[in-house]
């Protein structure tokens, strides 16, 4: 269960980071806020068609660090990491699930569906049924219908 303070902090940082990142032609993929022993670790993942460069990361880190400092977020000392999402890109927003239909994904749920909490399979569809968003996953030649609101974590799976 995510602490409500951490959830709000993540949302606040997302709201500040998204326009900064978009102004450089990039897309915000994920914000992680982790409380370490004496400081916060804030991780920003961003992407764009064609990939992210080291210069992109450096520029966004400088700009976003200034913005976070002005808004006193997080409220204690922090380390800011800015990077591309990598090969195991997190799937966070609805458009991520639409974009990566047909790809292999790893999904962890807050409660079991059909007796399973962790899924690894092909994302076949992302649909809405009776006002609820559903992922259709093929795993071991069987189809599973997973409610979006049960997902704790979802990532692409890269095969070498």
Swiss-Prot record:
UniProt cross-references to Pfam families, sorted A to Z: DUF150_C, RimP_N
Superkingdom field: Bacteria
Classification via InterPro entries: Ribosome_maturation_RimP, RimP_C, RimP_C_sf, RimP_N, RimP_N_sf
Keyword check for Disulfide bond: no
Subcellular location as annotated: Cytoplasm
Keywords, alphabetical: Cytoplasm, Ribosome biogenesis
Gene Ontology biological process terms from the UniProt entry: ribosomal small subunit assembly; translation
CDD domains, sorted: YlxS_C (cd01734)
Annotated Gene Ontology cellular component terms: cytosol
Principal location class: cytoplasm
Role, per record: Required for maturation of 30S ribosomal subunits.
Similarity section: Belongs to the RimP family.
Name assigned to this protein: Ribosome maturation factor RimP
